[in-house]
């Protein structure tokens, strides 16, 4: 009997040793996973040195994956089967994702540095109270022009209809953008759901067609940089890259009204490492890191202490940091339901067909 007890005791000891080894290995694996952060962001939308600095300061390794459109990002997160701890979508997509329960509500007890974000960039209609997102970059829709190809700077939307701009204007290929500039030229909201206002706008846009050289998306950069068009309607973020390559280009935000856009940090429901996600948010809220990122990417930072550290000519540039009066007249694109999304798309298609 003693031999049997000894044998059983030996078996139990072996099991305990094996269990201990397995637990240790599992702990090491989990520890290694807990020290990894997976970021899903636009391409070339962060200074790579910041990712290295984040790892040095926190010990957390970064896996950086990119998308080329909000829709591509949304589809991948919606389908599941992925692990993203941080994503950086635009404002209208944040609205959609929170409504579809794809985002984790933020725990502000874990966030440090929110006071660095300007109050004008918080509590926007797409995320009231910033329950799901923290501003990363922001910008405007405006007019980029080549000062050697125009006699007067086109500072207002109505200027685009001047006859001297025949076959000179590039428009961004988007229903909200084109109909929005038309609505704004009347002083209407770019989120208008007034049928009469929309009809007036389309009629006015028909009269713009002789001045339109092309309706494009990414191709606008090439046209403007290579002096192949005098004027373009596009986003400030795109313009910052154009200005670096063509010293004759200028950018203006029409003071009467225009679009205000945001790209914000969110934590998707695909998150595996929330602690690392909050560590990254806090890291990017530090002024020195927001400054480095703004200088690398060239976009406008919502971090006020970081903005104050920019070169004087940059932070005083009203093209990228409009004054308070201009900011009052800027609107974000509100989320439309299926009916109004379809309405705008149909009107935009009519406009493009008329142009042909």
Q: What residue ranges belong to the model's regions?
A:
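Periplasmic-binding protein-like
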Residues: 198-207, 245-269
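Mature extracytoplasmic/periplasmic domains
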Residues: 268-328
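Conserved C-terminal helix/tail region of periplasmic/extracytoplasmic solute-binding proteins
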Residues: 324-356
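Extracytoplasmic ligand-binding site segments that recognize negatively charged/polar headgroups
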Residues: 83, 88-228
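Ligand-binding "clamshell"
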Residues: 98-105, 127-131, 241-253, 315-318
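Early extracytoplasmic/lumenal segment of secretory-pathway proteins
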Residues: 7, 19-96
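N-terminal Sec-pathway targeting helices
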Residues: 1-14, 21-23
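A ligand-binding cleft/hinge motif common to bilobed small-molecule-binding domains
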Residues: 93-96, 225-226, 231-248
